Structure formats: C-alpha cells, structure tokens
C-alpha cells in the first residue's frame, strides 16, 4: 500500500492511512476467513453468465422484490451463475446512481439478508458508486449545516476549468448555501450528484470500509462506477489521471489482503486505449473492465462470423 499512498498523499498522511487501511483489511480477513481464503485474482471464465437487473425487476405476489428476484432466477433462468444487481441503495435520482446511503438497502427492495440470500446462490456484482453521492445524503446535509468533513469536492469558480472533460451539459460547479457562506461543489453528472474529494485520506478510508461491507454481504464483483473521474486536478482533463490508477491499484492491494476473491471492474465508458490501462501490469490493478461497446458487438459478430 505504501507505494500507492505516497503517490497520492503527503508522507505523514500516507503513513497514517496505510496503518488504518492495513488494520481494516487484516481485521476483516480475520473476521471472514472464508473470504480471506479465496484465491487471488480473476476466477471467472467463459462459463460465468450474469443477469443484469434492478432489485425490483420482478414483482412478486408476496414478499420483498429481492426475494421475488431470487425465486424468479431459480425457477425461470437456468444456466445463470451470477447477478449484476444494479444500485439497490436509497437514492434520489439517476436510476439509483445518486446514492443517499451507501450502507443501507432501499427498504422498498428488501434487506441485506435478502441480498445475502442472492449471494448464496449466485456470484453478485454490486455497483460501487464512489465518484459522487446524493445531495440528499447525510454527508451533504452535514456539510450544508456547517460540519465540513472534507468529503465533498469544492472548487473556486474563478479558477480555469476549461480542460475538464464534461460528460453532461449542466454547470460543472453547483453553488450551495452554508453557514459559512456560499460554497461551490463539484458536480460532474448533476446538481444532485456531488463529487467526492479523494485528496482527503479520511474519505478514502471511509469508502474502503463501505466496499468491505459490500464484500461481507455477497459482492464478488465491484463495478467501480465512473471511476475515470475519481481524482481531479485543475489544469488537466480530470479524467483517467495517474492518481486515479493509483487509487484502483490501492483498492486491489487492499482487497488482496481482506478478500482476494473480490474482483474490481472499473466502468470506463471509453475507447480501448482508455480501458486497457486499468489492467495495470496484469496483476496489480483491475481484474476486468466494464466495456459498454462490447455487448452490442457480440450479436453482429455471431451473425457475420467476423470478430
């Protein structure tokens, strides 16, 4: 971890965070020997078939939607080995990708016990929506009340943001009122989705703890949503920066200690040249990359015989 952290933080912060993350990972491994004993690296192969679905994709006659989804998969969808369970947390917009609380299951869908039951039968992929959090989250409410933990990214609108890659057309910065006066938070995707500040080591520790909760509740794949945007630095595109790759490598090292079988799957939504670097040297970064162009190309490839 040391090599990655020293590329992200000043020496004292890096040492402190390394100790914290090391303890977090080893404590988790001791408490979950079944996860800690898994083989390191990618274990999926061509036989792995995942359904992608929201938790309420199936409406059962009784019981929670998540229980209904498990029953439907067991009875109607033979041959599946896994489930990409789309965001199943309380949310405020963007079809679940504006998470209000990372640590709760949306009660309209069910409970963590329902999620665990799915994980006992299928390999689960969770969405780790860790670039941004909902404006309705506790973190933002604290910030608006004057308790700034440094988790939310702010920027001076007077600075030059012209190089920043914009995936959407709304303003990059959103002005909010706080007891300390107006503040300008970074909102890559919408005013309801406030970007997190990974230059704060306390935030990274918190996110690592959240990801362990996901592993504890059955996640075998962590789809790192919008991962290319994680680290921002003015004067750059703020996209796929070297620091972002160090963050992914750090998470890989962290999970190699805590739960080696958990597979990191960055969601890039880019070209091959942007996707491939997230594999690192083949063993030190992501095990897979979530590649949007690939699925629509599979059908024509079968039809034409041309890959």
Regions inferred by a protein language model and the residue ranges of each:
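A mobile, often basic/glycine-rich helix-loop segment
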Residues: 301
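Short, intrinsically disordered, charge-balanced linker/junction segments flanking boundaries
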Residues: 304-307
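Acidic/aromatic-lined carbohydrate-recognition and catalytic surfaces
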Residues: 2-205, 212, 216, 227-297
């Amino acid at each position: 971890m040391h090599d990655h952290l020293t590329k992200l933080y000043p020496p004292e912060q890096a040492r402190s965070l390394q100790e914290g993350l090391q303890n977090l990972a080893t404590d988790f491994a001791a408490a979950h020997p079944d996860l800690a004993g898994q083989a390191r690296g990618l274990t999926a192969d061509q036989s792995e078939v995942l359904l992608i679905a929201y938790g309420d994709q199936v409406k059962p006659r009784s019981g929670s939607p998540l229980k209904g989804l498990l029953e439907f998969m067991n009875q109607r969808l033979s041959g599946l080995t896994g489930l990409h369970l789309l965001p199943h947390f309380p949310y405020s917009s963007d079809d679940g990708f504006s998470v209000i609380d990372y640590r709760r299951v949306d009660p309209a869908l069910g409970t963590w016990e329902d999620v665990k039951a799915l994980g006992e039968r299928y390999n689960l992929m969770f969405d780790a929506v860790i670039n941004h959090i909902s404006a309705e989250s506790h973190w933002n409410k604290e910030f608006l009340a004057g308790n700034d933990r440094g988790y939310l990214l702010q920027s001076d609108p007077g600075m030059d943001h012209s190089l920043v890659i914009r995936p959407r057309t709304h303003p990059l910065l959103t002005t909010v009122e706080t007891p300390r006066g107006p503040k300008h938070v970074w909102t890559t995707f919408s005013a309801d989705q406030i970007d997190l500040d990974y230059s704060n080591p306390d935030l990274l520790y918190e996110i690592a703890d959240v990801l362990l909760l996901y592993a504890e509740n059955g996640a075998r794949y962590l789809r790192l949503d919008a991962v290319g945007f994680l680290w921002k630095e003015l004067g750059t595109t703020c996209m796929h920066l070297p620091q972002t790759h160090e963050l992914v490598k750090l998470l890989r090292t962290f999970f190699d200690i805590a739960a080696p079988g958990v597979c990191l799957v960055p969601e890039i939504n880019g070209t091959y040249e942007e996707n491939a670097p997230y594999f690192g040297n083949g063993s030190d970064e992501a095990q897979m990359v979530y590649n949007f162009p690939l699925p629509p190309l599979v059908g024509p490839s079968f039809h034409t015989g041309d890959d």
